[in-house]
Amino acid sequence: MDEFQRXSNKHXXWQQLFLXPLFFREDLXAIGHDHHLDRSGSSEPTEIFFSHFFSFLTVKRSIRRIRKQNKSISLFGNSDSNKLIEYNKNFSFKSMLEGFTIVLEVSIAMRSKHFIKGMDGWNXLRSIHCIFPFMEDKLPHSNYISDIRVPYSIHPEILVRIFRRWIRDVPSLHLLRLILHEWKNSFSQENLEKXXLITQRGNTRFSLFLWNSYVYECESFLIPLIKRFFNPXSLLYGSFPDGIHXEKKIKDIVIFLLQKISTKKIWLLKDSFIHYVRYGERSLIALKGTHLQVKKCRYHLFHFWQYYFHLWFQPYRICSLELSKTSFSFLGFFLNVKMRPLVVRAKMLDDLFITDLITNELNPIAPIRSILFSLAKEKFCDISGWPISKLSWTSLSDDDILDRFDRIWINLFHYYSGSINQDGLYHIKYILLLSCAKTLACKHKSTIRVVREQLGSELFTNSFSKEREFISSSFSKTRSQRERIWNSEISQRNPLXXFWQKMENKQIEN
């Protein structure tokens, strides 16, 4: 990226306005591929597929086809519905997606680089577990939380309007419009209503780029708008790209909302504070205030998506909860805020005072029953939690079987190391340990006792290794029993927790 930027400093002004010349840069394919590999983010795929058939010569030919085509003919090939659904086999459409996505990634990344450095109060973190210390510090001082599921079914013209603030090249905007409409028409109506923007079908890079751009647009206007109501002095226009247009749009939205409420109600929001955190499509807004203020915030969120993105925001996508009375799920944890009494002794001269101090504490709880259900689905145990052999792994070597069970336990232990119900995790370990022994016994057509005699202590030491747990136990000698250790190396949700979260989201939607 830096090399490409140094080579184009002389023409930076017109390159920011016009993207069409970038389609004909022969070195952009390699630069865009390296740029994609270097990007960090929890939602990025671990394996990058880059077509060996891709070349910018194909993009040039596709552009010529667009110029010469008849309006009644489909843009990227046969309009037959059966062939259109399988658009990933269409060579022209796939090449156009790859080329256009690379151009957008490089161009927008170059323009937004100095804006990202100037963002005040924004923290982009690599590890999921960095969220939980923040929540432990902020949520106990809040009494309400709004759980928001960001809507992802959006019209292509709204996406074009989003990119219009970044792209001034009219031909590129027309090309983007054609691609987005073809992308929309490539899905059946049922899939379009559920997930048209972040679907895993087709070009993953393109859908990921659309999702990140859409979320950035939402947060660019939503967070300052909320700050305007809760703390009018905290809104900084300098942190926005294209600050003039952003300031104008925000003022218009604020003026519209101010007409709906009186000045007395605005006064109630002055002494409140608000915290915002997001992972993927889930956003949390923690608020200290009254129930009336929570209803106001919910009302403004509905109108924000309705008037700015022109889409219907389903009521189930915003769930407001009182932290002291209920718990909520986030990133595979059950979270609640409970009161913790403390006995404080203060000595003043000859007098000794004993008083009770009550503080709030965030309690992250590992969903043991949901993990057991996931293990049963993966055939590690039955529905009652009794360990069974993993028959599909009996063709592997003993070392591979031990290593796979070891990785499953290590990932679970590290992900839920900060939970308060550690005893339930060791119950999960017991199930995995017996399932491993039964799998080896089934492979060698023997019993668990014979396997233990043959492997000896190797089954219980090398597999499910203790050294990672020893790190946690060594810290526990020098810290309070209530403090927790969060692993800063975890960058994505545990697969078992992700499966449980998907099941819960389906229940909420139904």
UniProtKB/Swiss-Prot annotation:
Coiled coil: none
Keyword check for Ligase: no
GO terms under biological process: mRNA processing; RNA splicing; tRNA processing
Cellular component GO terms held in the UniProt record: chloroplast
Compartments (UniProt record): Plastid, Chloroplast
Top-level taxon in the UniProt lineage: Eukaryota
Stored Pfam families: Intron_maturas2, MatK_N
Keywords: Chloroplast, mRNA processing, Plastid, RNA-binding, tRNA processing
Main location: plastid
General function of this protein: Usually encoded in the trnK tRNA gene intron. Probably assists in splicing its own and other chloroplast group II introns.
Name of the protein in question: Maturase K
Origin species: Thuja plicata
Gene: matK
